[in-house]
């Protein structure tokens, strides 16, 4: 069985974001790019994806995109791809505060009375980023804690971003109560960090980083992660996996992530596809 016929779930992408292109490459209209990305995802076996918000405007765009693409006649519906969204404030944007997110979340949850109409399936991405420090660290910690509480209050998945902040991330999750469905997005730690997150009850989501030559520690983490706690993602349009580095990423590339994980674990890619899809569906309730 070839990888192209396997079913995959891209648990984290940003299809609302503009795709970077070299200056000499014509930029397609955004709607055309989206339709093309959805069609290629379907061809690659990607049947489900979650579009992730990083701020109030980004989250509103993710929700609108997911809702629009799921309408009859929309590209996702036409290609047999189901899409959901998350609402969240990336640590880079922590200084903006969560008021806009709370209002958007309340409106969306009120709108989706029936589960079949639900678009919002998680809070995030949120967390701590001590590499860039675009927002002061105390503000990052405060806003992360508030979003942990939002996920717990509304029984939604929590999508966590952490970079060079493992100690504070783990401490804040432990102190505020880890939501039942917590996902460490784009996991880039090694075995020690993986065990700390797993001990909290979190799941680990691996991106194209797992294909990078210098990411042996990430592959080791993927190898030790329990199969029922493992998800795959693209983080599109970022972190394009080998051999497509240097081009915009998209959901159709998630099978490359799954294949790299399967190789690291010494198992069949089909088993990684089946498990990661089931895990993502359980985590997001879809």
Language-model segments: residues:
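Mid-domain alpha/beta scaffold segments of enzyme catalytic cores
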Residues: 1-286
């Amino acid at each position: 069985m070839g990888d192209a016929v396997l079913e995959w779930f891209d648990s984290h992408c940003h299809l609302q974001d503009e795709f970077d292109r070299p200056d000499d490459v014509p930029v397609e209209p955004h709607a055309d790019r989206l339709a093309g990305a959805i069609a290629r995802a379907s061809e690659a076996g990607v049947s489900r994806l979650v579009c992730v918000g990083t701020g109030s405007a980004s989250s509103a765009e993710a929700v609108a995109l997911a809702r629009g693409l799921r309408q009859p006649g929309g590209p996702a519906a036409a290609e047999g791809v189901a899409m959901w969204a998350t609402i969240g404030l990336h640590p880079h944007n922590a200084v903006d505060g969560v008021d806009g997110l709370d209002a958007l979340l309340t409106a969306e949850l009120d709108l989706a009375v029936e589960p079949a109409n639900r678009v919002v399936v998680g809070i995030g991405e949120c967390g701590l980023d001590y590499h860039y420090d675009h927002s002061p660290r105390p503000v990052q910690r405060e806003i992360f804690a508030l979003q942990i509480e939002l996920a717990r209050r509304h029984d939604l998945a929590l999508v966590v971003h952490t970079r060079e902040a493992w100690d504070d991330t783990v401490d804040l999750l432990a102190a505020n109560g880890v939501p039942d469905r917590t996902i460490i997005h784009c996991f880039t730690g090694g075995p020690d960090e993986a065990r700390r997150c797993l001990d909290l009850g979190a799941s680990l989501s691996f991106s194209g980083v797992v294909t990078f030559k210098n990411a042996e520690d990430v592959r080791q983490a993927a190898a030790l992660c329990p199969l029922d706690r493992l998800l795959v993602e693209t983080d599109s349009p970022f972190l394009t996996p080998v051999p497509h580095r240097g081009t915009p990423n998209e959901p159709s590339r998630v099978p490359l992530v799954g294949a790299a994980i399967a190789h690291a674990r010494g198992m069949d890619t089909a088993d990684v596809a089946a498990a990661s899809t089931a895990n993502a569906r359980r985590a997001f309730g879809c």
